[in-house]
Amino acid sequence: MESFLRGDYHVHSTFSDDAVSTIAENLAAASAAGLTTIRLIDHVRASTEWVPEFLAAVAAEPVPAGLTVLTGVETKIMDAAGTLDLPPDLVVGPGGLDAIVIADHQFPGDTGPWSPTTAREKLDAGLPVAEALDLLIDGYIGAMRSVSAGQLAHAFSILPKVGLSEDDLSAEQLERWAAAVAETGTLVEANEKWACPSPRVLQAVITAGGTIVAATDSHIASDIGRYTEVQALLRAVVPGKVVGA
């Protein structure tokens, strides 16, 4: 587990409006923490125009010895088809981003994103839990299949916000989701900030042949590479395919 925790695949900089540390500060903190890999990511939506400047800023920073620096942008799933809230001209691969980080910031409804309040209202009005979860699973799968290199940020963190939990996922739903994770080569975070996904979900990823990475979701450099919740999650999972393990 120790080598697994030497990666931090979800680190925000001041390119995100809710983060306080610069790219340089993040790299210095990662090096000081003894990390070997860091993924620098920031929040985007379809109207975002600064991704080239973000990539240029990352490229301009000297990389500390022994540290691999990856890039990405974090974007939300918009609907059950897996539409992502991304700028239309993004480049993923050589000359561009290393990955798209997919997040369930809102609930992917059948015709667009639902706020947690809207999702709760629909459930209270009679939307069956299984049908709601199918929408979420479909959204995840569509999103994963729409990108060439993906990573799931704090998977299923939307569920407590709408009055549900990961325990509400059926075995079939979880297996279908995990199979798509493995099929698409999407990385799945064990996320420190949100303490998710659960050991059951992480185990499903491993069983399906998917890959788990450690992530703090840090918005300040002092949090980079500091894991408590992730260690607890991983202790409950049978050893499997985790980066660095």
Describe each PLM feature range.
Residues 211, 226-245:
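Mid-to-C-terminal alpha-helical segments outside catalytic/metal-binding sites
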Residues 110-112, 222-226:
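Short, charged, surface-exposed secondary-structure boundary motifs
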Residues 1-85, 155-179, 196, 207, ...:
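An N-terminally biased module of ancient metal coordination in phosphate/nucleic-acid-related enzymes
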Residues 38-40, 100, 152, 188:
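Hydrophobic residues within beta-strands of alpha/beta enzymes
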Residues 51-183, 235-238:
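Extended substrate/RNA-proximal surfaces in nucleic-acid metabolism proteins
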Residues 184-189, 194, 215:
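His/Asp/Glu-enriched short active-site or ligand-binding loop at hydrolase and phosphoryl-transfer sites
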